[in-house]
């Protein structure tokens, strides 16, 4: 019987790459995303089914705790179990520090931090209910290791995810659950297109130039693609990582060394 994973933000980008890789590893996948993303999620589901695994779409607003609880219940019921949660959903904000508003902070913390907290709580309770030793895998970032200018709000949320990952790992270890995080660098996805465009508005550089400059420091000589990140998540979701918990692992091609 296949194990079951739920991937938040699974309709596109890194979430799609993770879903496809976990399906190749033999997982059935609940693709969780905002209801209006169901059409995009259908493309992810096609990739999962092409790997001969089951897939369902679960409508989820990750900032709503009750919705998160019910989404995990739905995933477990439809797919017949629940073994792994990938807290992948997240947003970026690109603003000078002095222009960040209270509303900006509320929005980015709701999506990037509160949702991770809600997911950890809901997944752990479901693991306990089903009697499984589960795995929770959170989305961090190179910005969880080093703060970046113009990304101050985003950086603080990712530092929060790092601390939460470490704390949750210690609390849930007696139950046999592991909690880890992946920390991508420069990934060629829609989020980085947004970051590049917003930075261009601020510093006047041509579109693509900021992405190029950030990528120039990567030791392996190229920005990453979702498949690079998915490979690490694959390890963290597998039995090969059973003795790994509380870790925030860089997958940045050699940008930061920590």
UniProtKB/Swiss-Prot annotation:
**EC annotation?**
1.1.1.76, 1.1.1.304
MF GO annotations: (S,S)-butanediol dehydrogenase activity; diacetyl reductase ((S)-acetoin forming) (NAD+) activity; NAD+ binding; NADH binding; quinone binding
Q: Temperature note from the UniProt entry?
A: Stable up to 37 degrees Celsius but is rapidly inactivated over 40 degrees Celsius.
The protein's matches in Pfam families, at most eight in alphabetical order, are given as: adh_short_C2
The active site is formed by 154
Q: How does activity depend on pH?
A: Optimum pH is 10.5 for the oxidative reaction with L-BD and 6.0 for the reductive reaction with (S)-acetoin. Stable from pH 7.0 to 9.0.
Q: Where does NAD(+) bind?
A: 12-14, 33, 37, 61-62, 88, 154, 158, 184-189
Give the domain of life.
Answer: Bacteria
- Relay the activity regulation note: Slightly activated by Ba(2+), Ca(2+), Mn(2+), Mg(2+), and Co(2+), while Hg(2+) and Cu(2+) cause marked inhibition of the activity. Ni(2+), Zn(2+) and Cd(2+) have no effect on the catalytic activity. Is also slightly inhibited by lactate, pyruvate, succinate, acetate and formate.
PANTHER family, per database record: 3-OXOACYL-(ACYL-CARRIER-PROTEIN) REDUCTASE, SHORT-CHAIN DEHYDROGENASES/REDUCTASES FAMILY MEMBER
Self-association state and partner proteins as the record states: Homotetramer.
What function does the entry list?
A: Catalyzes the reversible reduction of (S)-acetoin to (S,S)-butane-2,3-diol (L-BD) in the presence of NADH. To a lesser extent, can also catalyze the irreversible reduction of diacetyl to (S)-acetoin. Cannot oxidize meso-BD, D-BD, 2-butanol, 1,2-propanediol, ethanol, acetol, 1,2-butanediol, 1,3-butanediol, n-butanol, and n-propanol. Cannot reduce (R)-acetoin, acetol, dihydroxyacetone and 2,4-pentanedione.
Protein name per UniProt: L-2,3-butanediol dehydrogenase
